[in-house]
Amino acid sequence: MVLCDKGAHELGNREIRKGFCERCLYPEYFDDEEAATTTPTIKKRPPKLTWAPKKKRRKAIHLSCGCSYYGGIDCEDGFTHRGITHVHTVPDWLLLRRHQEPNLLPPPEHNNNGDGEQNNNITNQSQPQPAESVGSPDLLAELGGTFSITSSEWRSIIR
């Protein structure tokens, strides 16, 4: 039996190896004799449950041209694609959701509120793109060799 320096407590194996009495140094941590020899148990907290925010519901809309897009059900605005203005509305979407077949409704009529022409009947308004040129533009040809910068000029620009 080994006592501490003050002679008040019996030292355990761990305290003998450390060379000091933990009960004398830290009396607030020890209530009884058994607590000095046992190690405290560490309890793990359960992981905090976090819920991911709900994603906004979207509907897939397949256009007659073969293109598809996803539109939010709360979006009442439309968009123009290949010259045709497409507008999707919530009642159409809810009616489509009740049925299994997506092609039950006729195509919606588009109202432009008198702002301009209706482009519903025009199917192809795409214009051919100009051919790409291989040479340099005329402006650079007129300037000549003003764009040749020497290595010493580059160093002065970088500094």
UniProtKB/Swiss-Prot annotation:
Subcellular location(s) of the protein: Host cytoplasm
Primary location recorded for the protein, binned into one broad class: host cell
Zinc finger (unnamed): 65-81
Residues covered by region (Disordered): 102-139
GO MF annotation terms: structural molecule activity; zinc ion binding
Keyword Secreted: no
Entry GO CC: host cell cytoplasm; viral capsid
Identification of the protein by name: Protein C2
Organism for this UniProt entry: Tomato pseudo-curly top virus (TPCTV)
